[in-house]
């Protein structure tokens, strides 16, 4: 998919025998998953109805025209996208994960530190994985204003203030 689309979730497995599916959502609130309209995998458009919110990022859903477990199984690992223009406008200092991935990470002294590779959330906060400059190694840091002091999505960079515990002589 191109940058005009954002992945809102992925179908992880069938659920039951009636064609329901379990979906891992990437929305802040799983109940918002279907609020923006029909979703697509890039080929097919899906109308989805939430049956149950299972956890903070998992729902059980019914997809129109999917009526059996066999049909639902064919959708396993299918990513579901929405046009970015259908999403609500963000307030200042809010970002979609897809807008941050690929941004160059620059230290406060203007040295290049790396590139944002991926964003995770293990419960307490978002974690930014950074692929280190001129290396195959990566490191992870919490996504906070104290650490990522400036974010410029238009010019595709962030400014990183390394936490005191890490420092610039730690070998990262």
UniProtKB/Swiss-Prot annotation:
Top-level taxon of the source organism: Bacteria
Cytoplasm keyword on record: yes
UniProt domain PRC barrel: residue ranges: 92-167
Biological processes per GO annotation: ribosomal small subunit biogenesis; rRNA processing
GO cellular-component term (any): ribosome
Keyword Chaperone in record: yes
Subcellular location as annotated: Cytoplasm
Gene Ontology terms for molecular function: ribosome binding
Keyword field: Chaperone, Cytoplasm, Ribosome biogenesis, rRNA processing
Domain notes: The PRC barrel domain binds ribosomal protein uS19.
Membership in a protein family: Belongs to the RimM family.
Known function: An accessory protein needed during the final step in the assembly of 30S ribosomal subunit, possibly for assembly of the head region. Essential for efficient processing of 16S rRNA. May be needed both before and after RbfA during the maturation of 16S rRNA. It has affinity for free ribosomal 30S subunits but not for 70S ribosomes.
Quaternary state and interactors: Binds ribosomal protein uS19.
Protein's recorded name: Ribosome maturation factor RimM
